[in-house]
């Protein structure tokens, strides 16, 4: 079984679902998502631990004239993210299958296309192929927002497209420049295969401006402040299943891109821009935290909490330390497992508050739906990184890596952890406790909500007990990924010592 089967299976299932009678389309797509999940589990089960290189490699020439390969592979950076993708898409499709959608064939087709694009981006081992899948992700979400969104969906779609296309333009320019400059440097033929590009060290000035091109694209997609101008309208207008997978896994493709592409290909630039990136992360952490704490819109609390959490993840990546990088990878998974059920819970609470997502219309749900409130409490505690949760381990590792790199930055970031506890508890207490809301109906958790939320909550609990599931698989590859940047940083410190300038030395593990 090859990775191509895993990548294109969701799209194939969505096309088969379109042939079904209309009442069966959603259930067929949902059951099909379990097949994709099973295939992903089979790859994870066969994944060899302690191996830093690629596994399950597919490598075929795609466009020979441009040196573009259809190269796929799994390693410690992407194997758990692939599994996360299939879990969250499956949960979202089951949530969707219990609802009526206009033009259901088109709706489930775009969901299948989105899952295939995300899986392709995670598995791509050719820079041009990664860019193709990265841009392909925009198409289904353009239609999911524009055709099935709510509120100001036209405005939301326009902003999403403009921001994403600008980011994609920068990424395309950076990718082309990387391939061309690498070819000029070696005097060989043009290639975009990542393993080949990593063998060549571009000039410092070239690395700097190409780094900025990729950084803009990834920071817009995640997004981090101040690149988040599309987020409020986009997240507010997306249908709940779409926003759950967008925040849960699509945003992770951008964070993953920093690890897969930026750090190994541009080590000098990664060190050169380390401090600006860390400062940007701090600004974004506090911006997301403050907005999440002050807004009365439950969906926006989750949206801006995602900005803060993704900023923590980026902080760990640019600590350029193994602990920070592993914490970032672990929290990519943790955040996906937390944010998707949070959006489902917001939708469930809104149904019980007369369709309103305003926190002022909620309250008292815990007294009438204690099981639903229990699920919400587990997710909220995971969000605030309660000791004992997998999120706590991830954030601890991020802060440890940041402390090893820049102590002052880690102290300021730690205060952001306290802010996360404040907005997570505020969301839970206001929506599920306090007074009884104006329109709260007496309804316990239903099958529609249970099939999407309960399995993810169980995974959260399993990872809390056994976080090594992800850590053991990622460690060898992660260390190899950040090694070029660490070597560059060490060379910079040596140069400063040779010049007689003081250098702050921090122990690294």
Which residues does each PLM region occupy?
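Alpha-helical multi-pass transmembrane bundles of energy-transducing inner-membrane proteins
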Residues: 110-113, 117-209, 220, 291-358
